[in-house]
Regions:
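Conserved catalytic core of nucleotide polymerization and phosphodiester-bond processing enzymes
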Residues: 1-216
Length: 216
């Protein structure tokens, strides 16, 4: 904690000390000392300040979804590549690839217009309303875009002679001849090739060659 206090902007520390009573009432400080909570919150705020484009997208997508839920059949945008529309009982977030994320039974509740949709709750495994917010929605979209890029790369690899025998999260495992005709450098290049909808995205793949599967 002392090291964090020295490293962060003093104004962030003071700001979070001012939020401490609120955090205690909300139960956010359970399991840690008040000073530890202030330290953690100050680090989070410092990250947000240093990554303002990301936090702006959190807010932008959150606002777009709230507007769309309250105004069916109208398209709202977030950032340069995302659009949102409520149609019938579903909220659609259109990704850069054209694929859509679908949130069933979207609704706004409470004074803060908290967003909910129906899904399988993580712990109870029951179908119920799930709260969400801008940051979580951007996380969903980011993971979906990564999935789209991986799926785009699959056929490209196989057309070049890299037979995919297994996928693990964001990895493709290919079986190739034990000679010089193919190698992991070529595979990296194929996986880093951007589709037109992702133009300008900084995408890099890293791989290795081995006689058995392992984590790098």
């Amino acid at each position: 904690v002392p090291a964090i206090r020295k490293a962060v902007d003093p104004s962030l520390w003071i700001q979070n000390e001012g939020k401490l009573d609120w955090a205690i009432k909300k139960g956010l400080v359970e399991g840690m000392t008040p000073e530890t909570w202030v330290a953690f919150s100050s680090v989070a705020d410092a990250w947000r300040r240093a990554n303002s484009h990301i936090t702006a997208l959190w807010e932008g997508l959150g606002n777009a979804c709230q507007e769309a839920i309250g105004t069916p059949n109208r398209i709202f945008t977030a950032g340069k590549k995302l659009s949102v529309k409520r149609q019938g009982a579903y909220l659609y977030v259109r990704l850069p690839s054209g694929r859509k994320l679908v949130y069933p039974a979207p609704a706004l509740s409470g004074e803060r217009c908290d967003m909910t949709y129906y899904g399988i709750e993580q712990y109870s495994k029951k179908w119920r309303p799930i709260k969400t917010y801008g940051g979580r929605l951007v996380e969903n979209a980011t993971q979906a875009v990564a999935c789209d890029l991986l799926l785009e790369a699959g056929p490209r690899l196989e057309e070049a002679g890299y037979e995919i025998v297994l996928s693990v999260h964001d990895e493709y495992i290919c079986e190739i001849p034990d000679d010089e005709t193919r190698n992991h450098r070529q595979m990296e290049e194929l996986m880093s090739t951007l589709p037109t909808w992702a133009e300008g995205l900084p995408l890099v793949a890293a791989g290795f060659e081995s006689y058995r599967y392992r984590k790098e």
